[in-house]
């Protein structure tokens, strides 16, 4: 058992990098909010990944929030290498509002980032992104929180994923 697996299940995201013929998408679980004001996110990516090279080259990336309906695309993004995998995916890349890196039309949300900082930690680089803009499907985020009926994905292990139940438990 790998120790990091003790932190799973974790939300799964798609990280879009590059643009034009270099546009690329990878699946990533290691994504987190780092600051509310200014809004910043962090994503840890191994240097051997194409996404790592493209983020370094363009200093921008987009975090896309997939739903269960995008599971096949998440799987392809996480298991195939390089921009050629886009031909096998059923996603539509669309222009982002503030960055040149495209967003994913089918995603529940797209968070556009410019690289604010990078730091190597062990075998991964933490890319800190300052959020310049975000878009989302209003019905998927009602009342300022996720609408669980939209089946937000979480990664359990290798090919196993779960969604969140529609039942909410409140602490008192």
Curated annotation (Swiss-Prot):
Keywords: Flavoprotein, FMN. Signal peptide: none annotated. GO terms for molecular function: FMN binding. Its cofactor is FMN. It comes from the Archaea. Belongs to the flavoredoxin family. This is Uncharacterized protein PYRAB12460.
């Amino acid at each position: 058992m790998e120790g990091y697996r003790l932190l799973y299940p974790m939300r799964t995201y798609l990280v879009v990098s590059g643009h034009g013929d270099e546009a690329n998408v990878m699946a990533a679980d290691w994504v987190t909010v780092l600051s509310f004001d200014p809004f910043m996110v962090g994503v840890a990516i191994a240097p051997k990944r194409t996404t790592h090279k493209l983020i370094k080259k363009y200093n921008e990336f987009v975090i896309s929030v997939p739903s269960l309906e995008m599971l096949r695309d998440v799987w392809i993004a996480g298991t195939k290498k390089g921009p050629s995998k886009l031909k096998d995916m059923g996603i539509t890349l669309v222009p982002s509002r503030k960055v040149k890196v495209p967003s994913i039309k089918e995603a529940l949300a797209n968070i556009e980032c410019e690289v604010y900082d990078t730091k190597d930690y062990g075998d991964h680089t933490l890319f800190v992104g300052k959020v310049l803009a975000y878009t989302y499907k209003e019905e998927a985020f009602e009342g300022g929180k996720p609408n669980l009926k939209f089946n937000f994905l979480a990664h359990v292990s290798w090919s196993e994923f779960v969604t969140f139940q529609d039942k909410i438990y409140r602490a008192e």
